[in-house]
Amino acid sequence: MFCYHESIEKKDLGKGVLFQYLGKGQNMNVFHWNMAAGSVVALHRHPEEQFGYVIKGGFEIELEGKKYTLKEGDAYFIPPDALHSFVAIGETEAIDVFAPIKKEIPGEK
C-alpha cells in the first residue's frame, strides 16, 4: 500500500489540530498530525501503544503526571492506558503509530 500526501484527506479537529489517517497494516495504524502553536490534545488514554516522531516543532507532553519537552527529531513512546496530553510548541508536525490498530479514529464516532 502507498499513501500519496496530496490525496489523503485532512481532518480538522478544531482548535488548531489537523490530522491525516495514513492507513493501517495487520497490527498497526498511522496518523500524520499538524498542530498550531499552543494547540492542545487534552489528557486522555487509550488501550493501544503509541509511538511518535516529531518532524517539526515540538511538544510538551504530560505522561502519567510528569512533563517532558520534545523537539524536532525526538521520538516518544506512550504505553497502553497511560494518561497523557500534548501541547504544541510552535507549529508542530508529527507521525504517530498505534498498535494494535486504534479503532477510535479522532473526529469519527
What are these regions (language model features)?
Residues 65-80:
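Short acidic-glycine-tyrosine-enriched beta hairpin
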Residues 49, 53-59, 64:
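Glycine- and acidic-residue-biased ligand/ion/polar-headgroup-sensing regions
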Residues 31-45:
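Conserved short histidine dyad/triad with adjacent acidic residue
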Residues 58-60, 67, 83, 93:
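Structural motif
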Residues 80-104:
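Ligand-binding loop in jelly-roll beta-barrel domains
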